[in-house]
UniProtKB/Swiss-Prot annotation:
GO terms for cellular component: extracellular region. Its main location: secreted. It comes from the Eukaryota. This is Antimicrobial peptide 7. It comes from Xenopus tropicalis. One of its GO terms (biological process) is defense response to fungus. Amidation on Leu-18 is required to adopt an alpha-helical conformation in a hydrophobic solvent. The absence of amidation leads to a decrease in cationicity leading to a more than a 10-fold decrease in antimicrobial activities. Expressed by the skin glands. Keywords: Amidation, Amphibian defense peptide, Antibiotic, Antimicrobial, Cytolysis, Fungicide, Hemolysis, Secreted. The modification Leucine amide is found at L18. Has very strong antibacterial activity against many Gram-negative bacteria and the Gram-positive bacteria S.pneumoniae and Enterococcus sp. There is moderate antimicrobial activity against the Gram-negative bacterium P.aeruginosa and yeast C.albicans and weaker activity against the Streptococcal strains and E.coli. Has hemolytic activity against human red blood cells. Seems to disrupt the membranes by adopting an alpha-helical conformation. It is found in: Secreted.
């Protein structure tokens, strides 16, 4: 499904914000 890639993107963006 799309949840896998979306979670990966969310994690990457979150780490960038930190």
């Amino acid at each position: 499904g799309l949840l896998g890639p979306l979670l990966k993107i969310a994690a990457k963006v979150g780490s960038n914000l930190l």
